[in-house]
Amino acid sequence: MGRSLVALLVLAWGAGAQDRLPPVAAEKMTEAQRKAVADYRNLRNADLTGPPWSVLLRVPDWVVPAVEMRLHVQNRPVLPNRLTELAILIAAREWTNNYEWNAHSAAAARAGLASAVVSDVAAGRRPEHMAEDEEILYDFCAELLHNKSLSDATYARALARFGEAGVVELANLEGYYVYLSMVMNTARSPLPAGAKPQLASFPK
């Protein structure tokens, strides 16, 4: 990625990007928020420090269900990690969510997803050189996001390749990461310190 494009992305991300819902200071938390923080720590063995969890903390009862869904994706996936990460990137690209994209583009590379596929998704293009299972997954996710439904042909291909459990997991993945993207886009959640945005907004 050229320096000029990086600079444009940084400017676009920074324009009007004030964090609307920053982390709640510990001394200002309600009892319900403190309990949600403790439950989060017990589930993830980590502190609740940033988005999307710090945003969800405004409604504490949302935190644990959202974390449990994330833990399923991490620890008990139906699909291989390479396909799971591709599905997540498709959702993050659709909603231009740089926070999820930055985290999961690195995870996708570790899972074996080709860099050319990642680059094409980032640019909003259907990748040209995908494995067959990646093509089936991409078409499923893109069609569901764009058309809000699936054709019989697209559903049949996904069902034949991934089975009923895989199809349901794919729909859940897209819904879950769209949900997180909507939460963070509403809050204008910033990237971690030192991170650079990798996604430009789609033309209006």
Annotate each language-model stretch with its function.
Residues M1-L8:
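Sec-dependent signal peptide recognition
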